[in-house]
């Protein structure tokens, strides 16, 4: 046991001496200074944020041009579509396609004249209504 005691004393004394060397006297804490607040203002000019709204006029001659109109709507531009120079069946297909596009982007489509439609994305609000010629006199029929 003498050997074990010597090892224990040797290791315990060494550990004790290490602790004494690491001990430091307490220092006075520095006074906490208040944080400086930035003098930035969070004001942004509305003119720099708001882009000028655009309205696109479209007069498709073939059904394939409906995709270009849909691209304008996806770019958040309002589109007035004149379908007077296209065959009636193709005009119906274009209106169906644009109705789906407008629904998908959360917009609106309104008929503003005979075969003339206003398609708007969700960022454009339309107020008011336009009555078509003789609309009040006869029962409503699908164009």
From Swiss-Prot:
Where found, per UniProt?
Answer: Cytoplasm
Tree of life domain: Bacteria
Might you report a single GO cellular component term?
cytoplasm
Among Pfam families, the record links this protein to: SepF
Q: What is its main location?
A: cytoplasm
Q: Which GO terms describe its biological process?
A: division septum assembly; FtsZ-dependent cytokinesis
**Do you know which InterPro entries this protein is assigned to?**
Cell_div_SepF, Cell_div_SepF/SepF-rel, SepF-like_sf
Q: Keywords in UniProt for this one?
A: Cell cycle, Cell division, Cytoplasm, Septation
KW Transferase (keyword) present: no
The record's subunit annotation is: Homodimer. Interacts with FtsZ.
The record describes the protein's role as: Cell division protein that is part of the divisome complex and is recruited early to the Z-ring. Probably stimulates Z-ring formation, perhaps through the cross-linking of FtsZ protofilaments. Its function overlaps with FtsA.
Q: In which family does this protein belong, per the annotation?
A: Belongs to the SepF family.
Q: Which PANTHER family match?
A: CELL DIVISION PROTEIN SEPF
Q: What is this protein called?
A: Cell division protein SepF
List the top taxonomic levels of the source: Bacteria, Bacillati, Bacillota, Bacilli, Bacillales
The gene designation is: sepF
